[in-house]
Curated annotation (Swiss-Prot):
Entry's Gene Ontology BP terms: tryptophanyl-tRNA aminoacylation
Organism for this UniProt entry: Danio rerio (Zebrafish)
Annotated ranges, domain WHEP-TRS: 3-59
Protein name: Tryptophan--tRNA ligase, cytoplasmic
Pfam families (UniProt xref): tRNA-synt_1b, WHEP-TRS
Phylogenetic classification of the source organism: Eukaryota, Metazoa, Chordata, Craniata, Vertebrata
Length: 463
């Protein structure tokens, strides 16, 4: 394995290569290929050092890996801190289901959700974006028997602006809340970001409030939704902290090292944090909502990179007298430069932020969205494009509601009838109004509204 310093120097050199190609006005394909190599190098650097690459800041001596054992040769890297794939199509989710031991969201499950709710399945279910689950049938059994359950999802507030990829779990959770008419708790893990990132507590608090505004702008029902900051709620809720301590007592250091790859040089806050992310899975962590009830099951919609936290939670739950939480896992929202990694707020060029203007959205898509098209118009007309690696088409699968229109775009692009520029225009025309609408809704989220959502209180739900 290369040393951290060797990797740092390789990333630096590749960055110079990218800049040189751009300065010489190299072809788009040449630039994209060089950028892909750079992104992969940065991922390798982070996997080995546990740090994001920063120009002019070589790694310190003694840096050790923080994300556990590397995947087997040819396997995708998927954990709570990094996601990468060597395939232009992105992560192989069928293999990931086998590797993680979860169950596929099949048509039978989608049909059952539709039948019980009386609603058309969300496009994320229809298109396999939420592709994996744990015990979702138990949640549907409870719903069928008119027993209550609740939703739990979260966000790590590491920056003031969130990007379109962050919207995915909240869009789907909002739909679940609406069709099942159930309460929802949203954990903002500001403590986690303080422990993992170079941030002050004050910055974490500010990011928490700003991220809460974006979440509220998704349209959640204030009467059924409680948003909480770990740094605030932990000190205000003895019941929540008791559950944290129960989990801490029943999970060994050796277990969390095996699950999360912690090392002897990690601060003790990191080692104990998984118990804090586990605690919202238990209904009596929220006595203001559920009283002391332990029998209200939890459903967690999340990206599959969060699954290690909840595998641990599901393992410990029966040993401390609680129900195992159920999960629905989503695929990753790819970076603009390609599906080999997920969108990240740390790279402005790979990211479309919810604060971007229509012009910025257009420029980012046109300049940076990886294309599955051919090198020339003539070749593209003859051979067609590849929607399976084309980022613009991937984004449309997330945001374009009309299934027939999406399929027509797929066919036209694959046949060569639609050019890359036309496909990108379809994406731009889809994204711009969605982000503009979100920005308008966010303007109306006042400090008082944020306070309402973040105040511990009774929520309305059917027992």
């Amino acid at each position: 394995m290369s040393s951290p310093l060797d990797l740092y120097e390789c990333v630096t050199a590749q960055g110079e290569t990218v800049r040189s190609i751009k300065a010489k006005k190299g072809s788009k394909e040449e630039v994209d290929a060089a950028v892909q190599v750079l992104l992969q190098m940065k991922l390798d650097y982070k996997r080995v050092t546990g740090q994001d690459y920063k120009a002019g800041c070589p790694p310190q001596d003694g840096v050790t890996p923080q994300d556990g054992a590397a995947p087997q040769d040819g396997e995708d890297q998927v954990d709570p801190w990094s996601v990468s794939s060597s395939s232009a199509k992105g992560v192989d989710y069928e293999k990931l289901i086998v590797r993680f031991g979860s169950s596929k969201v099949d048509q039978e499950l989608v049909d059952r959700i539709s039948r019980l709710t009386g609603k058309t399945p969300h496009r994320f279910l229809r298109r396999g974006i939420f592709f994996s689950h744990r015990d979702m049938h138990q949640i549907l059994d409870a719903f069928e028997q008119q027993k209550p359950f609740y939703l739990y999802t979260g966000r790590g507030p590491s920056s003031q602006a969130i990007h379109v990829g962050h919207l995915i779990p909240f869009i789907f959770t909002k739909w679940l809340q609406d069709v099942f008419d159930v309460p929802l708790v949203i954990q903002l893990t500001d403590d986690e970001k303080y422990l993992w990132k170079d941030l002050t507590l004050e910055e974490c608090r500010r990011f928490t409030v700003e991220n809460a505004r974006d979440i509220i702008a998704c349209g959640f029902d204030v009467n059924k939704t409680f948003i909480f900051s770990d740094l605030e709620y932990m000190g205000a809720s003895p019941a929540f902290y008791r559950n944290v301590v129960k989990v801490q007592k029943h999970v060994t250091f050796n277990q969390v090292k095996g699950i999360f790859g912690f090392t002897d040089s990690d601060c003790i806050g990191k080692i104990s944090f998984p118990a804090i992310q586990a605690a919202p899975s238990f209904s009596n962590s929220f006595p203001q909502i559920f009283g002391d009830r332990k029998d209200v099951q939890c459903l967690i919609p999340c990206a599959i990179d969060q699954d290690p936290y909840f595998r641990m939670t599901r393992d410990v739950a029966p040993r401390i007298g609680y129900l195992k939480p159920a999960l629905l896992h989503s695929t990753f929202f790819p970076a603009l430069q390609g599906a080999q990694t997920k969108m990240s707020a740390s790279d402005a060029n790979s990211t479309i932020f919810l604060t971007d203007t229509p012009k910025q959205i257009k420029n980012k898509v046109n300049k940076h969205a990886f294309s599955g098209g051919k090198d020339t118009i003539e070749e593209h007309r003859k051979l067609g494009g590849d929607p399976d690696v084309d980022v613009s088409f991937m984004y449309l699968t997330f945001f374009l509601e009309d299934d027939e229109q999406l399929e027509k775009i797929r066919q036209d692009y694959s046949s060569g009838a639609m050019l890359t520029g036309e496909l990108k225009k379809s994406l731009i025309d889809t994204l711009q109004p969605i982000i503009a609408e979100h920005q308008e809704k966010r303007k109306h989220v006042t400090d008082d509204i944020v306070q309402q959502f973040m105040t511990p209180r009774k929520l309305h739900f059917s027992c």
